[in-house]
A protein has these predicted regions:
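Extended, loop-rich substrate-binding clefts of extracytoplasmic carbohydrate-active enzymes
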Residues: 1-7, 88-143
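Beta-strand-rich N-terminal accessory domains
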Residues: 1-69, 74-75, 81-84, 226-251, ...
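Acidic, contiguous internal or C-terminal segments within carbohydrate-active enzymes
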Residues: 15, 26, 39, 121-168, ...
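A short, structured loop/turn motif at beta-sheet edges
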Residues: 39-42, 108-115, 140-145, 174-179, ...
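Acidic/His-leaning functional-site neighborhoods
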Residues: 94-109, 212-286
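Beta-strand-rich interaction surfaces with strong enrichment in secreted/lumenal proteins
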Residues: 136-138, 286-291
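C-terminal or internal capping secondary-structure element at the end of a domain, subdomain, or sheet
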Residues: 145, 156, 289, 295-306
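Active-site/ligand-binding surface loops and adjacent short beta/alpha elements
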Residues: 159-161, 169-249
Length: 306
């Protein structure tokens, strides 16, 4: 069931699918805000964290839900200078995580199982990512899962670079009597990297296929060169897993990335973030994708409760 409601002084949309409720602000960042699930005993479990107070005038700074990262994920650099990217035309500004998460969208379609929204780049975004394109966010909601597809449609005459991603703020720990150290993430065989202060990728050779969320070493670590396009996490012991999988419309990509990040030791969330590639993709060309004129590319992510 799809309804519109007032929430935190904003008019938002809500989808109910079986035991799941999805709270969304399609016009502001195409932002999935919350995902709740009603348990068998009538209690409600928060899957995606959303703060009790949110300043929508600073949407890019709200720590919750799933910010859309476009055209590039995380920090961009130009010859070591933060906040710029290596465009085909040379040095241009690029904020952390791009423009979409704080940008305006137009709701193109709302159906019983989800919606499609189109990015409306402002003057700054048009100047600094100067291409002719349509960027769509398509969410499909299910009883115990969601699928989100990012599509870049090139309507111009030159190829367009991109390396988009997601910033899921998962509620963790989600049991009142457990701590972070009781949860673990299972990764496919992969390599770990960190980004230095000039935008270079430095290999972290401590990465393991099973990592504990209580281990500070996984915070702000980029996992890439993944042997499979999937991962899962949950309480040690194998119950109540959250599973993620991803794919490109244009085939497997060696530099797909999964980043793990949180803010503080006592933050109510831990972010598990599927990206099309590592940060600073435009300069390193690792995980950089190109869309030819009059074609489109899509990146689909599925999150499922196990």
């Amino acid at each position: 069931m799809h309804t519109e409601i007032a929430h935190q002084s904003e008019q938002i949309h809500r989808w109910q699918r079986g035991p799941s409720t999805f709270w969304v602000h399609p016009e502001k960042g195409a932002r999935l805000m919350r995902w709740d699930i009603e348990m068998a005993d009538g209690s409600v479990r928060e899957i995606l964290h959303w703060p009790d107070q949110a300043d929508w005038s600073q949407a890019g700074k709200i720590r919750g839900g799933n910010p859309i990262l476009f055209p590039f994920s995380a920090r961009s650099f130009f010859k070591g200078e933060l906040g710029y990217w290596k465009s085909p035309q040379g040095k241009r500004p690029m904020p952390n995580h791009g423009y979409a998460r704080q940008g305006a969208f137009q709701l193109e379609n709302a159906a019983a199982d989800g919606f499609i929204a189109r990015f409306l780049p402002d003057t700054e975004a048009q100047a600094n990512y100067p291409f002719d394109y349509n960027f769509f966010v398509d969410y499909r909601f299910h009883d115990l899962a969601l699928e989100v597809t990012l599509t870049l449609e090139n309507t111009g005459t030159e190829q367009i670079p991109w390396s988009a991603g997601h910033h899921f703020y998962f509620n963790l720990p989600w049991h009142a009597d457990l701590e972070r150290s009781h949860y673990e993430i299972h990764l496919p065989k992969c390599k770990g990297f960190r980004q230095d202060t000039r935008g270079n990728l430095l290999e972290d050779k401590t990465v393991q296929q099973v990592e504990n969320f209580g281990n500070d070493a996984i915070n702000d670590r980029i996992h890439t060169k993944l042997k499979r396009p999937d991962a899962k996490f949950g309480p040690a012991g194998g119950e109540e897993w959250i599973q993620l999988s991803w794919e490109d419309s244009h085939g497997p990509a060696a530099w797909h990335a999964l980043t793990t990040w949180t803010d503080q030791h006592d933050s109510l969330f831990y972010c598990v973030e599927p990206w099309m590639g590592p940060p600073n993709a435009a300069e390193t060309e690792k995980g950089l994708h190109w869309v030819a004129p009059n074609t489109s590319q899509s990146y689909r992510v599925r999150v499922e409760l196990g």
